Structures are given as structure tokens and as C-alpha cells.
Curated annotation (Swiss-Prot):
It comes from the Bacteria. GO terms for biological process: dimethylallyl diphosphate biosynthetic process; isopentenyl diphosphate biosynthetic process. Its main location: cytoplasm. GO terms for cellular component: cytoplasm. It comes from Photorhabdus laumondii subsp. laumondii (strain DSM 15139 / CIP 105565 / TT01) (Photorhabdus luminescens subsp. laumondii). This is Isopentenyl-diphosphate Delta-isomerase 1.
Length: 176
């Protein structure tokens, strides 16, 4: 089982913990990332998380998200997971947008308590979803993402909703 990096509120590494243990209670702030894939038509790829996921299975979310390994730079993890989840090889450095901290409980199953780095990748490579990670996915015009979230709020992950709201308010100019 993989380990994730425990961090303090300033994103300083303070240790490592088993990935499952990190999500069982809300005590373990750990480093994570989310990435939005945007194509040349200004469409954003949105994925439905696999039903086998521990937290928020079957929910709609950003293009992909994960955790860097303890010995891995976050940008490298963004590139690695694009290939593992979506079959997309990224040859350019992903564009960092911002980072934020959040804590959310999923039913009686567990928590996300992350210091999340948000990235964007521009590519026209079509995704080939790994069924262990992704149940479905589609591209949506960048101008329609907020309406999609609003109309499907109860089926979207909490970090997707938080990230897109922040992107609209503070980072939208970096997406086009």
C-alpha cells in the first residue's frame, strides 16, 4: 500500500502515513493535488470516480486527483497520474494554479483532509479511462462547468466544487 506525505498547515513535510489510514479519520493533513485537463476547444474533462473508490465512489469530479509519493515532486505526480488514470502522457510541466486546505467527511466511511495543489494541463490527447480509477468521463465547455456543478451538486465531490468556485473567482484567466 502506498504512503502519503503528512504536512503542517504551511505544507512542510512532517511525516508519512499509509494512504488508507490517512483517510480513516480527519486527523491527518496530507499533501494532494487536483488537475483539470483542458483541450484546445476550451473544454474541461470531468470524470466520474470508480465505484471501487473508498471515498465519494461514483461522484463526478475534476479531471483527476491523487497524492504525490513521499519521494516525488508534485508536478511529477501530476504527470504520472495522468497516464495511470487517463492514459495521457504529459510532456510539458503542468501549470500550477494555487493550493488550499480542506477537510470533508464522507458518510461514516472516512475523510479527506488535504492540502491540495491545483493544476491545469492543456492537451488534445483523448482520455483512455482506467476502470479501476474512472467509471466515465466527458468534456464540457469551460463556460458550462459551473452550471453543471450547480445542477448536479449532490453528485459532485466537495473538492471539485470548492476548486471550481475558486478558479472562477481568482484563476479563470489562467485557463484560457
Amino acid at each position: 500500500m502506498e504512503n502519503v506525505v503528512l504536512v503542517d498547515e504551511n505544507d512542510n513535510r512532517v511525516g508519512c502515513i499509509n494512504k488508507i489510514d490517512a483517510h480513516l479519520n480527519g486527523d491527518h493533513l496530507h499533501r494532494a493535488f487536483s488537475c483539470f485537463i483542458i483541450n484546445s476547444k476550451n473544454e474541461v474533462y470531468i470524470q466520474q470516480r470508480a465505484q471501487s473508490k473508498l471515498l465519494w465512489p461514483g461522484y463526478w469530479s475534476n479531471s483527476y486527483c491523487s497524492h504525490p509519493r513521499p519521494d516525488e515532486e508534485i508536478s511529477h505526480a501530476v504527470m504520472r497520474r495522468a497516464e495511470e488514470e487517463l492514459g495521457i502522457v504529459i510532456n510539458e510541466e503542468p501549470k500550477f494554479l494555487y493550493k488550499f486546505q480542506y477537510k470533508e467527511k464522507y458518510k461514516d466511511v472516512g475523510y479527506e483532509h488535504e492540502l491540495c495543489h491545483v493544476f491545469v494541463v492543456f492537451t488534445d490527447t483523448p482520455p483512455t479511462e482506467n476502470p479501476k480509477e474512472v467509471s466515465a468521463g466527458f468534456f464540457i465547455n469551460i463556460k458550462d462547468v459551473q452550471e453543471y456543478i450547480h445542477n448536479n451538486e449532490e453528485f459532485c465531490t466537495p473538492w471539485f466544487k470548492k476548486e471550481w468556485a475558486d478558479i472562477l473567482q481568482n484563476h479563470f484567466d489562467k485557463l484560457c
